[in-house]
Amino acid sequence: SRRCPGKNAWPELVGKSGNMAAATVERENRNVHAIVLKEGSAMTKDFRCDRVWVIVNDHGVVTSVPHIT
C-alpha cells in the first residue's frame, strides 16, 4: 500500500455537501488538493499523494468516502 503524509481518508464526509467536504479535506491535510466531481465523471487513474477526489451526486452530496487516490 502507498504511504502519504497526513490524514488520507474522510468517511465522516459521506452525506455532506461536496464543497464543504472539499474544504474540510484541504483543512485537515494541507498536502492535498480536493477536487469535487459528479458521479460517473472521467478521472485519471494515476496515484497521487496530493489529490483527493470528492465524488458527489446531482444534489452535490458526497456519495463515497473521499480518500487520497
Swiss-Prot record:
<keyword id="KW-0722">Serine protease inhibitor</keyword>
<comment type="similarity">
    <text>Belongs to the protease inhibitor I13 (potato type I serine protease inhibitor) family.</text>
</comment>
<dbReference type="InterPro" id="IPR000864">
    <property type="entry name" value="Prot_inh_pot1"/>
</dbReference>
<keyword id="KW-1015">Disulfide bond</keyword>
<feature type="site" description="Reactive bond">
    <location>
        <begin position="45"/>
        <end position="46"/>
    </location>
</feature>
<feature type="modified residue" description="N-acetylserine">
    <location>
        <position position="1"/>
    </location>
</feature>
<dbReference type="GO" id="GO:0004867">
    <property type="term" value="F:serine-type endopeptidase inhibitor activity"/>
</dbReference>
<feature type="disulfide bond">
    <location>
        <begin position="4"/>
        <end position="49"/>
    </location>
</feature>
<protein>
    <recommendedName>
        <fullName>Proteinase inhibitor</fullName>
    </recommendedName>
</protein>
<keyword id="KW-0007">Acetylation</keyword>
<dbReference type="InterPro" id="IPR036354">
    <property type="entry name" value="Prot_inh_pot1_sf"/>
</dbReference>
<dbReference type="Pfam" id="PF00280">
    <property type="entry name" value="potato_inhibit"/>
</dbReference>
<keyword id="KW-0646">Protease inhibitor</keyword>
<comment type="function">
    <text>In vitro, strong inhibitor of bovine beta-trypsin, weak inhibitor of alpha-chymotrypsin, subtilisin BPN', subtilisin Carlsberg and cathepsin G.</text>
</comment>
<dbReference type="GO" id="GO:0009611">
    <property type="term" value="P:response to wounding"/>
</dbReference>
